[in-house]
């Protein structure tokens, strides 16, 4: 496994994977959502200005401490929603990774076309799928990235912080 959204050139990595995919083969791809992670650059900026003498682990500890203090004083201030919050390495990766690319659905659509891959659908929670279907009852809309983009713009937290989807290489 690899992490495309942490590569210097994610499309180059994705192209390599698509290149070894057999005709008719399917691939599961996970990419950070620009809308879902919109608060991350703000958080990162607050802690990037911290003194360098504490290092990255010190910044992570300070971030987690401040978050928990905020949460105790205002329970509605839940900005995490991350299972990754409580381990040092996963919190560092989620909030402070030095290389991060975030995507919007139109970029995914463009990349799929460039790589000659067809979109097979998002791997989502049942509640998200049901909500989408209420707005877009035509079953074919599940495969239309433009419809998902409309939906996400109205529901910016729909995908959490990451898109997870399937695509196929044509036969």
What are these regions (language model features)?
Residues 1, 29-32, 120-122, 168:
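Generic beta-strand/beta-sheet core signal
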Residues 1-11, 27, 33:
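A short SAM/SAH-binding and catalytic strip from SAM-dependent methyltransferases
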Residues 5, 34-36, 125-129:
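Short, solvent-exposed loop/turn segments at secondary-structure junctions
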Residues 11-24:
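A short glycine-rich, Lys/Arg-flanked "PGG" loop and its adjoining helix->strand segment in the class I
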Residues 13, 53, 144-145:
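Helix N-terminus capping/helix-initiation residues
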Residues 17, 46-50, 124:
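Short, low-complexity, polar/charged sequence segments that are solvent-exposed and flexible
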Residues 26-78:
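Conserved class I S-adenosyl-L-methionine
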Residues 66-171:
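Rossmann-like AdoMet/SAM-dependent catalytic core
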